[in-house]
C-alpha cells in the first residue's frame, strides 16, 4: 500500500472511530454506570440511572450520538518516530473530524473566536486539538480520542498556589471547584487533577488524567492515596446523578503529576461527565489496530 492509500485508510479508520465513540461509551464507563445504579438506593437516583442506561441502548440501536453535544474533538497522540504517517497525522485527523461530522453526524461545535461564526465542520483554528508525545525508535502510534462537551468543560480551572498551602491547598482547590461547578457538569463525574509547576502544565496533566481507565491509580502511593481521599470527599458532597442528590458524585478521581518548582504548586481540575466519550486505539506500522476502550469493534 502506497503512502496516499495509507493516509486514506487511516483517515477512514479515525473518522469511523470518532463516529463510534460518540455513540457508544467505553466499556469501563458503562460498567461503572451499572455499578453506581446498583449502589444508589433513592428512587430518583435509580430512575436517572435507568434513563442513562436506556439512552445508551437507544444510541447504539438507532446509530445516533448518545448526547446531542458531541463536543470539540481533542486527540492525545503518542507516536513513535518511525511510524510511517507521523508527518501526515495532524492533517488527516482534521480530515477525519470533518468526515465524521457529516457521517455520524456530529453537532457543529467549532466557533472561530473573535470572528464569532461556526465553521459548520467541527474544525477551525487549533481545532481539533492535537497533543503530542513522541516515542523514540518506535513504529507504533497510540491515539486517545476525546469529545470535550460544553457542560463538562465549564468547571475547568487552574491556578498556582503558594508552597506553604501544601497538599491541603490542593485539596481545598479541588473541593471548591466541585462544590461550585460540579452540580451542572452532568454527574457522576470523572475528575482529573493535575499537579505541577504552572497553570499550563497542571492543566494539561488534568486533561490527560481523564484518558486513564477507571480503576487505575497514580503510580506514586501518596498521590494514589490522595485520589481515594478526594473521591470520598467529593462523594460526600452528595451531588448524585445529574446533580439531583445521591451517595455517589464521581466515577473516580485521577491525579497526574510532575516535579515542580520549590516556590510554586500549580494545580488544575478538568472533569468528564457521566457520558465520558473517550477512545484509545493503537496502530502498528501497517495500520493494523487494537482498540482498548471498546470491545468487539471493527472500523
Positions of predicted regions on the chain:
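Non-transmembrane, aqueous-exposed alpha-helical and coiled segments at domain scale
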Residues: 1-299
